[in-house]
Amino acid sequence: MSVLTIGDKRLGAALLDAGLLTDEELQRALERHREVGGSLAEVLVDMGLLSERRIAQTIEDRFGIPLVELHRVEIPPKVKALLPAEKAKELKAIPFALDEEAGVVRVAFLNPLDTLSLEEVEDLTGLVVEPYQTTKSAFLYALAKHYPELGLPVPPPPSGEGQKDLKLGELLLQKGWISREALEEALVEQEKTGDLLGRILVRKGLPEEALYRALAEQKGLEFLESTEGIVPDPSAALLLLRSDALRYGAVPIGFQNGEVEVVLSDPRHKEAVAQLLNRPARFYLALPQAWEELFRRAYPQKNRLGEVLVQEGKLSREALKEALEVQKGLPRAKPLGEILVELGLARPEDVEEALQKQRRGGGRLEDTLVQSGKLRPEALAQAVATQLGYPYVDPEEDPPDPGAPLLLPEDLCRRYGVFPHRLEGNRLVLLMKDPRNILALDDVRLALKRKGLNYEVAPAVATEAAITKLIERFYGKAELSEIAKEFAKKQAEEEVPSPLELDESAAQKFVKQVIREAFLQDASDIHIEPRQNDVQVRLRIDGALRPYSTLPKGALNAVISVVKIMGGLNIAEKRLPQDGRVRYREGAIDVDLRLSTLPTVYGEKAVMRLLKKASDIPEIEDLGFAPGVFERFKEVISKPYGIFLITGPTGSGKSFTTFSILKRIATPDKNTQTIEDPVEYEIPGINQTQVNPQAGLTFARALRAFLRQDPDIIMVGEIRDSETAKIATEAALTGHLVIATLHTNDAAQAITRLDEMGVEPFNISAALIGVLSQRLVRRVCEHCKVEVKPDPETLRRLGLSEAEIQGARLYKGMGCERCGGTGYKGRYAIHELLVVDDEIRHAIVAGKSATEIKEIARRKGMKTLREDGLYKALQGITTLEEVLARTIE
């Protein structure tokens, strides 16, 4: 059975989001792929679902990888020699152009989304690879022609393109729209790059309208200057499925003299569209942007269900038309965007920005909002439930019936991302991300009938992450004790065991299991630690490490090897630390892991960090600020320039706060640059750069480069040295907003730390707008908390008396299954916000100490970390003991 590559998965998702494939079409293609193998693109073409050109266009639009007409490119021998013939055949890659000065080679890939092939070509050539895509026929022709040593028969070159381009060029010459010199120059470039002639000429200044007028004349079509006044006839639009209209760039707009009038955006698809219509047609040509506006008017909704039924032959176009006419008379469902704004879950400008992205790139509004980090998944689920009239379920608050999962098979739940929640009389409540998935509901009903169960299926909405965790918790559980027994048993069977060979299978099971459990328990890190006689595994949950499992010492090498292989690390190197990163996908779990290994006296230790996604980054309103502090915080981050510092130790939530700020202020009209080590959260719309010391890219060097990139906002992952501190301050003084993190114990110490790094006090006073120091304290578990009396010793150490907290209600968690017996579940931030005003500026210039600056700030209303922590303990959020443990006065 063939397995999908990462590139195939990316392609499938892009085609689905663009509306070029329905869910069922993709499912059928995946089933065929499992049978016949090859690439997903080849399967789609063979099944007639998409043309090769349309797939290429989608890859270019979505991933920025252009198409090269490889059969028309003359490849210099020294360029061809960069990749041996067998490797070119194996990797399905042919180098065709070389920029020696820049150290860049252009390579045509048959599977351009296969990152492993690209990386191998870079390793083999020692050059930076600029990827292009090519068609299968062009690749096979070029491979046989340029690598005769392979002994492949040379097929005929793909026909038609060269002749057409030549005619197009002559036509443009006749019209006087280009010069002979410009045409010859473009043809020379075409020979080098294999790009389309028209595209080259437009890049060189030919107006797009002139190109399309020439194409219309060449193909005998009427050119439409605008589609603004055209109102498509719905009955004409029904002649083409929405997916076909998008696939071929064709919109039927009406009827005249017994002919269907069709507007094209690509004249090459005229014959294919005529064949689909199977009736007389009159074709027009419009510019792509004008055509897209017309397409949106003709096909305002995807009508997925209707298209699936028509494609399956279960519904005629006439019946679909009749149903759509009836649908028009029904009350209009309120758009999701309106609901999100009305519920206060999203800002109007964020919804509008997402709608614009949706129009440009396809996909659903809700997915666009979540992927950009503008909307929390929980908020989306609540809005979808409101829009569709279904209940919203939070499994943490409303746990499932343990017997309900027995009603449905595991593979069905995983395939559709659904979960049987509970029985209510004769109704099965089914958790779904999208209750509109008719195919999922049909298959669930069928599965119930096969078991002789006649339950009504009642959809309810939950987040995808919540459903994933339920599936893993109820269907995917494996006992670690059994895996540990397997390690011990195998070790006992051999007098001289070879850990890697002996325990590889059990090690793989163990690593998968521990990642699964860490994911389900919201752990931030997994620690695999060798000790003298065994191996300890711990999970960091809510900031504290908890023992999780113990393995025999002989299991260490096997487990570490599995971790290294996952991250692409060198399994033979055991003397030096190594770092890596991997996207881990197993079952319903999809999580990014940052891996680190370190030699110790008892063997190698490994740490795996589970990275959050952009959609997990909270809004600034959810960062836990006390009311008065929040207003001052919003005012500071709204300033157009200056430097704002966020301080605290590792694990204090600085990154989350930083990106939450960027999420609010990095609007589309601003150029935002970040330099990080490493990049942990990939945020759409932000230019993110990763430190690379081996290549000489440091924080300071990146900052210098940023200043030449016309930035509005700069984020520095960490100010570590004097040079970085000085350049960051200089950037703030020259009209940029700089957000940076620093390691200090409190807010005032950040000022003296900059001074110690060599930044002049008068520059600090002029550039600094504020400092936020923060810590994370554990929250009292809501499921087992009880009211308690304060401990006298704790009060004494906090400098409080019982009279000072009289009337306050303090809580403590007693320990339960939900919190793992700790009494705490989740974490909450405490803050110390120092806002720089004139008095503090004068104190900085005068060289006042951190203690003196802190006292000035407190007189002006600043709450210290301990004071903010006490406020939140008295609110019942955390405990006095936790505040005492996390703060110093």
From Swiss-Prot:
Q: Where along this sequence does the record place binding of ATP?
A: 651-656
- Provide the residue positions that the database annotates as binding Zn(2+): 781, 784, 816, 819
Q: Give the location in the cell.
A: Cytoplasm
Q: Which GO terms describe its cellular component?
A: cytoplasm; plasma membrane
InterPro entries, alphabetically? Answer: P-loop_NTPase (IPR027417), T2SS/T4SS_dom (IPR001482), T2SS_E_N_sf (IPR037257), T2SS_GspE_N (IPR007831)
Any idea which GO molecular function terms this record carries? ATP binding; ATP hydrolysis activity; metal ion binding
Q: Which PROSITE patterns match?
A: T2SP_E (PS00662)
- For whether the record's keyword set contains Metal-binding, the answer is yes
Metal-binding: present as a keyword of the record? yes
Q: Which SUPFAM superfamilies match?
A: EspE N-terminal domain-like (SSF160246), P-loop containing nucleoside triphosphate hydrolases (SSF52540)
User: Pfam families of this UniProt entry?
Assistant: MshEN, T2SSE
Task: Give the principal location in a single coarse category.
Answer: cytoplasm
Q: Per its UniProt record, what CDD domains does this chain match? A: PulE-GspE-like
Assembly mode:
Homohexamer. Interacts with PilC.
UniProt lists the family membership as follows: Belongs to the GSP E family.
Question: What does this chain do?
Answer: ATPase component of the type IV pilus (T4P) that plays a role in surface and host cell adhesion, colonization, biofilm maturation, virulence, and twitching, a form of surface-associated motility facilitated by cycles of extension, adhesion, and retraction of T4P fibers. Acts as a molecular motor to provide the energy that is required for biogenesis of the pilus and the extrusion of substrates generated in the cytoplasm. PilB ATPase activity is also essential for T4P extension while antagonist PilT ATPase activity is required for T4P retraction.
Show the PANTHER family listed in the entry: PROTEIN TRANSPORT PROTEIN HOFB HOMOLOG, TYPE II SECRETION SYSTEM PROTEIN GSPE-RELATED
Q: What is known of its domains?
A: The ATP-binding site is essential for assembly of pili.
- Give the protein's recorded name: Type IV pilus assembly ATPase PilB
Query: Which gene name belongs to this protein?
Result: pilB
